A protein has these predicted regions:
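Non-catalytic accessory/assembly modules
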Residues: 78-80, 133-136, 140-167, 171-174, ...
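Catalytic or ion-translocation cores adjacent to nucleophile or general acid/base/metal-coordination motifs
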Residues: 80-84, 94-96, 254-265, 556-558, ...
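A structural supersecondary motif
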Residues: 95-99, 293-295, 315-355, 597-610, ...
Length: 994
């Protein structure tokens, strides 16, 4: 790595103002100031090959119209240097970028891009900067009509409609309970201040949105003197500085914008209470569904104390903290989240009670204050304090495993800078963490607990879902549109009809820009798998891969599920839910909660059923993944096995409390589950593994858990009822039996990635401990290979819809090329061309979806046509069905294809961390996934030529003709097109199907 310039040194119009370091990233930093333009640049320099650049503007929410969000969409549409219909999507679909986005926050707007190529990064930076300087969208009203808001009228007798990408996105959040809760708290806490305005509220203020207001927002906010640029990775700093100065910054004299005072000013003191009605659709639950927040303003704290409050919040969020204990002692069996929220214009400490009722507000408030008083007086248990400190340290050590790290870091720094004017967030974080973790007396924690126990300003708020209110707001919108049309003169109506026609013609134009391309010959070779070894140790199949990272490792276990039968499968969800919730033979619940934090970092359970390519591993399995310090490995594995084997399932009152607490999380009818459910419904048709996972996590699990809860409550309510006790005993017995069947050494697999000095010891201790597990259960029943999952032999429907509590739809159509040998890597760029040139224009620009496109998953062997937050089913599915034919008709130049080659290569070869790459290689080996085949496909991407068009279109036609379709969303829209589907699931109804 090249040496950074020293403080005071001047390069290309920039002067180095600060030098620092971030040890967790292995990075040195330099902050540079460009006096002429007023711009600042922070360079975070380490050996990361994935480079990142982020252009960040300080953007206070000056109103409730979501103006900054609309402006963010407009900024990267077009500019004189890069004229296009939408140059952002040109770059996204035709460049070697590994990440790209535009993101609006409550205090800043950022435009990040990442790439593995320095040349590509600078070319994309040029597009971003040119668009910021001369956005074409602020001159041509039609961009605003597309991205923000427009009115359409086909003829004088037709209905007036209101459309727009951001409006559609915001309207899709109509029933977002937590978003509505955040808004209610901010409005009450910061009434009359900018901090009260949150993003994403256009659907409540659409009558006030105008193009002129958006243009005014640009003039108020966008200047280089109100901008921070962040460069990350092993970049060529001098080349970047020269480019910035010569091509951009030297052309724009600073306007000396100073918007930070807009975030400042006194906060009204005192305690307030408020309630807000949150829209919900008819049939949505009203009981046990509210969000109750206690929000404390932290404006008076120093930056160091705000960071420390984040550590304290992490401790209070734990199940064994004084706040959580106080809540349980007062009879509150709800999930209570505690977190520091720095995404607002002012930092706040948030206590959030989930799945509550408004009558719980006072009890919740009492619990929080009781817990805070305990902490202020006594601190927290030393074991919990040190476990949370260790968990934070592990997170810091593993930060480099995060893909697109340059973006994630810069987002945090951007928020910090927008409020403070400082860029040293991570350096300050490290110093503060060192100070906090060394505070053995917990004096900082006790002091902060005392401060928030009697805060200068706080609000207790409740967001209460009101079924039917969503429909009422939609009806109000439709009534307003009818009245608006009725108020228009014949001349105005004709003008709107012409404007609608003109907009549709303009939107249908294929105008793109390719002036940012690099040559495909410059693309790197795909990397081979990192080395690993495998074999039997003490009868356990083990794989190990040496890592250069000292002191930290990643681990994975695969338990065989072949013996499970009948209701075992439903109980698997309950079994996983109860881990760390019941005493075991060696550890009480409180000990488990603390040890989980300390020894099982990011521990996740999952189910899988690899296909025939996995050979003898083509069988149902349960995976357990975790990370930790290598010195703690043996303790972590021993603890994990104790959790899994020895839960006391006689504690049925506790089991009922746990189910009651977490049951709402299994309700798939919530709108936020739409995207994942849409993928699951489609994937289950083409993949055994996906079908297996869907059946184990289907909507019916929610009803199974409700039934278990009913049985347990009946036993508690009728202790003398023998039948009730028998039914409840059966639940305990089923859980014991399941644990015996699950935790066996039969066909057990263990993977480890760790430093070479520790790896042999880890594999030896793992195989020794695991070999002591039984191979048959305690009843002596031999395990078998038979799979008896209910409905397993019933083929999934080809075309499935699911009705959930949502205003819009998620649509997916899949093409399966895994077993199609004639499908080569060179066809992948053509897939992306079809998405960019046909699907996105038809569904997003000319349709009404928030976004749409085509993606592929190379290791999984399929591609997806998708649209999100889409009010149209019929037209979108028609577009999807015609994709192959449309591709055959596209007119692509070699330069167009070059861009799609770059994008396909970036999508096929995403960056991956050191530990993750080793774990992935071993997992692929276990699953029978060939890295050689994947790399051959990736290399073949570069061989794509215009001569491949017909073969690609024919293959895509064929694959889509037999591919599955799923639609998840609004029931009314789905039922309008019910003939399109073989099966319609009504998630909120127990019977499940209509």
């Amino acid at each position: 790595m090249a040496k950074l310039p020293e403080k005071g040194q001047t390069l290309w119009g920039f002067t180095v103002t600060e030098r620092n370091s971030i040890s967790m990233l292995g990075a040195e930093t330099a902050e540079l100031f460009h006096p002429f333009s007023g711009a600042r640049l922070l360079y975070i320099h380490n050996d990361d090959r994935e480079l990142g650049f982020n252009l960040i503007y300080r953007t206070p929410q000056l109103d409730n119209l979501d103006s900054n969000h609309i402006l963010e969409h407009l900024m990267l549409c077009s500019c004189p240097s890069y004229p296009s219909r939408d140059v952002f999507f040109d770059m996204d679909s035709k460049s070697y970028s590994t990440f790209m986005n535009g993101i609006t926050d409550n205090t800043c707007t950022c435009y990040p891009v990442c790439s593995l190529s320095m040349e590509q990064l600078i070319k994309l930076m040029d597009v971003f900067l040119c668009c910021m300087e001369e956005p074409e969208a602020l001159k041509d009203h039609r961009f605003f009509m597309r991205e923000g808001l427009r009115f359409e009228l086909e003829d004088t007798d037709g209905e007036l409609s209101m459309l727009g990408t951001v409006l559609s996105e915001d309207w899709g959040h109509l029933t977002d309970l937590e978003e509505n809760a955040d808004s209610a708290a901010a409005q009450a806490l910061y009434e009359g201040q900018i901090a009260a305005n949150l993003l994403g509220r256009a659907h409540f203020h659409y009558k006030e949105i105008t193009f002129e207001k958006i243009r005014q927002t640009y003039e108020q906010l966008y200047d280089y003197s109100n901008c921070l640029m962040i460069l990350y990775g092993d970049a060529d700093l001098e080349a970047v500085l020269r480019f910035l100065d010569e091509k951009h910054l030297s052309r724009f004299k600073s306007r000396n914008l100073n918007l930070r005072p807009l975030f400042e000013g006194p906060v009204s003191s005192g305690f307030r209470k408020t309630e807000v009605k949150s829209p919900a659709y008819e049939g949505s639950p009203a009981e046990h569904s509210s969000v109750i927040d206690y929000t404390i303003d932290l404006s008076g704290l120093s930056q160091e104390d705000v960071i420390c409050m984040g550590f304290c919040a992490g401790m209070m969020d734990q199940d064994t903290s004084p706040v959580q204990r106080a809540a349980r002692s007062l009879g509150l069996n709800n999930i209570i989240d505690v977190y520091l929220d720095t995404a607002l214009a002012r930092p706040v400490l948030k206590f959030r009670l989930q799945n509550g009722d408004k009558e719980q507000q006072e009890l919740f408030f009492q619990a929080v204050n009781q817990g805070l008083a305990d902490m202020a007086e006594n601190g927290i248990a030393d074991e919990l304090y040190h476990a949370v400190i260790k968990e934070n340290r592990l997170a810091d050590l593993l930060m480099r495993e995060t893909p697109h790290l340059g973006f994630h870091l810069s987002e945090d720094i951007g928020r910090f800078w927008s409020l403070t004017g400082r860029t040293d967030y991570y350096s300050l974080y490290e110093r503060t963490f060192t100070h906090f973790s060394a505070d053995q007396e917990q004096s900082i924690l006790r002091r902060l607990a005392k401060q928030v126990l009697n805060p200068p300003s706080a609000v207790l708020s409740a967001a209460i879902p009101v079924p039917g209110l969503a429909e009422a707001l939609e009806q109000e919108r439709d009534r307003w549109l009818r009245e608006k049309k009725a108020s228009m003169s014949p001349k105005e109506l004709q003008a709107l009809i012409r404007e609608t026609e003109d907009f549709k013609k303009w939107s249908a134009q294929d105008k793109s820009c390719l002036d940012f391309l690099i040559q495909p010959e410059q693309l790197p070779e795909p990397e081979e798998d990192p080395p690993f070894f495998s074999g039997l140790r003490h009868g356990i199949f083990c794989c190990g891969s040496p890592s250069p990272l000292a002191g930290i490792g990643s681990y994975q276990l695969f338990f065989d599920l072949s013996e499970l039968s009948g209701e075992d499968w439903n109980y698997l969800t309950l079994y996983q839910m109860l881990l760390t919730e019941l005493d075991t033979r060696r550890f009480c619940v409180e000990q488990q909660k603390i040890m989980e934090q300390e020894y099982l970092y990011d521990c996740t359970f999952d189910e899988l059923y690899p296909d025939a390519d996995a050979g003898e591993n083509s069988r149902p399995m349960m995976s357990v993944v975790w990370s930790g310090l290598t010195e703690d490995f043996e303790i972590s594995l021993d603890f994990l096995l104790e959790l899994m084997r020895n839960g006391n399932y006689e504690y049925r009152e506790t089991i009922s409390q746990v189910i009651e607490k977490y049951l709402p999380d299994y309700d798939l009818s919530k709108s936020e589950n739409g995207p994942s459910l849409a993928y699951s419904l489609a994937e289950r048709y083409i993949r055994q593994d996906s079908r297996f996972r869907f059946q184990l996590n289907s909507p019916e699990i929610y009803h199974f858990l409700k039934n278990i809860l009913t049985i347990l409550i009946r036993e508690q309510s009728h202790p003398d009822d023998e039948a009730a006790r028998t039914d409840a005993n059966q639940i305990s017995s089923s859980l014991y039996t399941l644990a015996q069947k699950l935790v066996s050494r039969r066909k057990l697999i263990f993977l480890a990635a760790a430093e070479n000095a520790s790896l042999e010891h880890i594999l030896d201790r793992a195989s020794t401990l695991l070999s002591q597990l039984p191979e048959r259960n305690e009843n002596g029943f031999m395990f078998s290979n038979h799979l008896s999952l209910p409905s397993w032999d019933q083929a999934p429907s080809l075309r499935t819809a699911a009705c959930i509590d949502s205003s819009l739809e998620e649509l997916r159509m899949l093409g399966d090329f895994k077993k199609v040998p004639e499908f080569k890597g060179r066809f992948l760029p053509w897939l992306l061309a079809a998405g960019d040139k046909y699907v996105k224009p038809a569904v997003r620009y000319q349709g009404r979806a928030y976004d749409s496109g085509i993606d592929f998953l190379l290791p999984a062997g399929y591609f997806t046509l998708w649209s999100t937050e889409d009010p149209d089913i019929e037209s979108t599915l028609s577009v999807f069905n015609r994709t192959g034919q449309a591709l055959a008709e596209l007119k692509l130049t070699p330069e167009d294809l070059q861009g799609y080659i770059l994008s396909a290569y970036a999508q096929a070869l995403p960056p991956i961390g050191i530990l993750n790459s080793r774990m992935r290689a071993m997992r692929r080996y276990i699953m029978g996934i060939s890295t050689v085949y994947i790399n051959e496909m990736i290399r073949n991407i570069r061989n794509s030529t215009v001569n491949d068009q017909k073969e690609a279109s024919d293959l895509i036609c064929r694959l889509l003709k037999s591919g599955p379709v799923s639609v998840v969303g609004n029931e009314k829209i789905i039922l309008e097109y019910k003939n399109r589907f073989d099966e319609i699931l009504k998630i909120k109804e127990k019977n499940g199907t209509v």
